[in-house]
Amino acid sequence: MSTGQPSGAVALRFFLPPKRLRPFVTTLYHLEIFGEGDELVEDWLHPEWANLRIIPQRTIDAGMAGGPLENLPRAVIVGPTSVTAHFRARPGRSWGIGLMPRGWARLSQAPTDEYADRWADAESDPAFTHLAALCGAVPLESGGLAAERDALLRELTLLLAEPAAREAEILRFEEALTDPRFHSV
């Protein structure tokens, strides 16, 4: 019988966004690592779309393309990547929000190429400080999985409401990148 509680040391949950947000957000994901003290989970992430990760207890160290591991800020924005990212995580929880190119364009006027293959502190980088309410949807202590997810979705709905400049052009780019006829770009 399942109790609904995660088994083992790592629980990773994915949530599809509501249909109105799917052109902008790939998924929301919640990672929780259980353990004692400095027990570490280590892994590598494949190249991916841009994303925002909120790590309330700053329990994740990461590096890109073989670079040194650094302790990530509480809210980290990552541009699209073409390299692997190596990470180590201590017990704690985090949320991630995968961003499609139009999602990035609606959340920031910063060109993605300025953030490609790197991360920035979303709470101090001037291009992202307006995301404070979104980052604040995940408190230091757990507010409960459903409550945090719903708070993130409320903030995303507000932030993604206005079209971005050149959105039609960005959509054509997205469609080309996700066309199943092409296997590499």
Regions found by a protein language model. Give the residues of each.
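Alpha-helical bundle regulatory/interaction domains
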Residues: 1-183
